[in-house]
UniProtKB/Swiss-Prot annotation:
GO MF annotations in UniProt: DNA-binding transcription factor activity; transcription cis-regulatory region binding
InterPro entries hit by this protein: MraZ (IPR003444), MraZ_C (IPR035644), MraZ_dom (IPR020603), MraZ_N (IPR035642), MraZ_sf (IPR038619), SpoVT-AbrB_dom (IPR007159), SpoVT-AbrB_sf (IPR037914)
GO biological process, one term: negative regulation of DNA-templated transcription initiation
Protein name stated in the entry: Transcriptional regulator MraZ
Organism from which the protein derives: Halothermothrix orenii (strain H 168 / OCM 544 / DSM 9562)
Main subcellular localisation: cytoplasm
């Protein structure tokens, strides 16, 4: 399971070191794609396969489903680690997530997310303000 928050610097070639705890969970090959809130989602292959099955079973007659699936899959790329434990993030994904030098890597149970440090800070500030309201809504869902 992925959890925690780490900050690492991305080099000029778009490579970033993934924390050792996350590397062992991700395995040899994994998938990175556009996420929500202008971050990147990174899935181990077994989680990607489950998600792929769910998304490809959505009705193509649904405009929202088509739009989401196109956006999600067209940005997806299979990744692997180099000898230094780094991944190379393609330029289109770096641009989407506005990744600069400092990148925040967070663990979210079945995936990791890569955030620009600036965007993550802004997200935390806004989420903190509504955290209690969100917690109450989660309670209404039985969580």
């Amino acid at each position: 399971m992925f959890m925690g928050e780490y900050k690492h610097n991305m080099d000029s070639k778009g490579r970033i070191i993934i924390p050792a705890k996350f590397r062992s969970e991700l395995g040899d090959k994994f998938v990175a794609t556009r996420g929500l809130d202008h971050c990147l989602f990174v899935y181990p292959m077994h989680e990607w396969s489950k998600l792929e099955k769910k998304l490809t079973s959505l009705p193509i007659t649904s405009k929202n489903a088509r739009t989401f699936v196109r956006f999600f899959f067209s940005g997806a790329t299979e990744c692997e680690f180099d000898k230094q434990g780094r991944i190379s993030i393609p330029s289109n994904l770096r641009e989407y997530a506005e990744l600069q030098k400092e990148v925040v890597i967070i663990g979210l149970a079945n995936r990791i997310e890569l955030w620009s440090s600036k965007r993550w800070g802004g997200y935390l500030d806004s989420a903190e303000e509504s955290y209690e309201e969100i917690a109450a809504a989660m309670e209404d869902l039985g969580i």
